[in-house]
Every structure is written in C-alpha cells, then in structure tokens.
Amino acid sequence: MATLQQIYSLYDTATWATQLGVYSFYTTDGSLSYLHLKTNVPVSRNTMWMVEFVGYAYGGAANIRTAIVFHTSGSVIYRIGAQNIYPGLTAQTAYTSTDGYVVIRVLASSFYYTGFVVNAYSTAPYTPNEVFRILAVSQNNNSGTGTF
C-alpha cells in the first residue's frame, strides 16, 4: 500500500518559486509499475512548473532524481519535458484529469521499497503565488491517461 503524506516544507514566501519537500511517498508494493499524481494545478490557468522527485528505489537498486516541466494555458498542457538523472524513477508525461487538473505519470524501475520526496518550482514570473500540492495518488499498471 502506498503512503502519501505532507512533510515539512520550505517555501519562498515572497514568490512561492521554490517549494521543497511538498510531499513524500513510500511503498513496498513492487507489483505495480506506474504512479499517477494528481496536482492542484488547474490546466485552465496560465502557469509553468518544474516538479522534481528525489529518493531511492531499493528494488531497482537505483537512486531517484527525475523532473518534469510543463506549461498550462487555455485548458491545454504545453511543452511537457522530462529529464531523468538516475534510473530509479522516470517522469513520463503530464495529462489532464477529468475535472481539469494536471496529473503527472511516473514509471519506477521497481516500487519494491521505494521512497522519494517531491519538490516544486514555479518557472515563470506570471505563475500565481500558490502552494503546489498533490491531491491524490494512484499506484497501478496504467501506462496511459485516465486514472484521474
């Protein structure tokens, strides 16, 4: 069973540009490969974000350091890009939930005893000053969209 919890977070209260330790994730279930994380970022708002995952995947014997960037505007997610530094977790894509929020999909080398923290960075001066949150998470074998 996956655990998602808010942990101590650090924020730049002037701009909310850097938000460290937004959430932590830990699971021992190695049978499911994908994680879908529903955020509080509405696709209809004009924003730019980089979301970073840092941790360790024991089952895959690999460090985790991956990030995904995206730009939302006019109910579309633009310029989705991912950079995977270590192979423990791969940021794959972002898609729109049925209620209009950004969902991030990641793939693990193995979720068997895997843990990571999530950091968020607003990457445009017009991104609203708001706290980035993970609203819901689903660990499953869905390699597509539609989990949320």
Question: Residue ranges of each PLM-predicted region?
Answer:
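Trimeric viral appendage architectures of receptor-binding fibers, tailspike depolymerases
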Residues: 1-148
